[in-house]
Amino acid sequence: MFLGGAVLLILCVLPAGMSRSAWLAAGGACLCVYAWHMDWADKFRLLWQQQRLRVVMAMIGGLCILLLVSHLLFVLKPDSARGRLFMWKITCRAITEKPLTGHGIHNFAAVYGNAQEAYFAAGDYESWEERVAGSPEYAFNEYLQAAVEWGVPLTLCGLAAIVICLYIGIKKRRYGICGAILSLMIFSFSSYPLQLPVFIVTFIALLLACVCGNSRWEWIGLAILAVAVGGFRLKNDLRIEQACREWMNVRVLYNAGAYESGEREYVSLYPLLKERAAFLFEYGHGLHKLRRAEASNRIMREALKLSCDPMILNIMGKNYQQKGDYLAAEECFIRSTHRLPGRIYPYYLLAKLYAEPAFRQPDKFETMKRIVLTKEPKVQSTAIRQMREEVNKMIVKR
């Protein structure tokens, strides 16, 4: 009864979520658990010996069905699928830069941003790639992200350890636990579950449940270890949680434009939240609004190590422009256009920069003006209309 209710709830929730990754993970894991329980491997070996031709035909038919399902999942949300494929393409380019050692933990976003910037700067790309490109925090593929951060050898070692745990679990006939691990592994191919602490803890617990015996002392030892690790992290985690609560309150001042009042709060929260790109961006942007260009750029450079958002480069460029360092401002704005060429805003900033009396460049201004007026945005908005109206009124004499 309980099992039937759980299955019914899953069937209700999965379609509503419109998550193709979740559908594949649930379907694939359930199929494997059923196959293990029904001893499909032994039956397959027997059929292969007796009716090899039928098995081959069935495999070809299954492959055709799989291709059809893949096509249907693609056309369900085509731009989303293309976006994932493009993300993985850029991630693979980042992996080739440091395949053995990786770029370091928590460095994915910055590395991805640099790789995407270099790719678009080369100019050899398709129009659909410009349309679907974004500034992701994660690779939407845990295996590729691990290869970027840890390097390929360490990633393969981690995968080997997981496979060994699964093998032991199957030998011990712990099919439900192995199915849960498998579903998480399938889901990890096109999402980012292991970037969330709850999934990491769950994954480790499932792996331990695969390999541990039935001894009470083993489980007591694991429980003591879990409590010790949790207790060790508890104090710092509580401090960060409290800092995040205070940050949410300070955001009210930031969104209201009270940058002077908010700046004092950002200074006090900085030691605890300096590893969060969103916090650093707000802090640096507030300093920019207060016309404290040097301090703003110092914070923005830190944010650039944690994020691939081109708005960071835009703010840095505006800070340089405030200081009169027009060449540095131009470099930042051009980098922003390469990082996400589909955005109109950095072209608008370049047009305004080339119209500056101290940095007047009529030819470049006309090029940027034409791009701002003719480039098709992803979504039409009031901001784009206002930018176009402003640029259209600007005249730079030769």
Which residues does each PLM region occupy?
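Single-residue signature of alpha-solenoid repeat helices
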Residues: 262, 296, 329, 364-365
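Transmembrane alpha-helices of multi-pass inner-membrane enzymes
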Residues: 25-34, 61, 158-161, 174-221
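Interfacial juxtamembrane loops and adjacent helix segments
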Residues: 105-148
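Loop-to-helix entry and N-terminal half of a specific, functionally important transmembrane alpha helix
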Residues: 2-10, 137, 169-191
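Alpha-solenoid helical repeat scaffolds
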Residues: 247-248, 278-282, 311-318, 344-349, ...
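Membrane-interface helix-loop-helix junctions at transmembrane boundaries of multi-pass membrane enzymes
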Residues: 1-3, 42-55, 163-178, 292, ...
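Hydrophobic alpha-helical transmembrane segments in integral membrane proteins
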Residues: 69-86, 227-257
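Helix-loop-helix junctions and helix-breaking kinks within/between transmembrane helices
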Residues: 4-38, 70-74, 151-152, 189-198
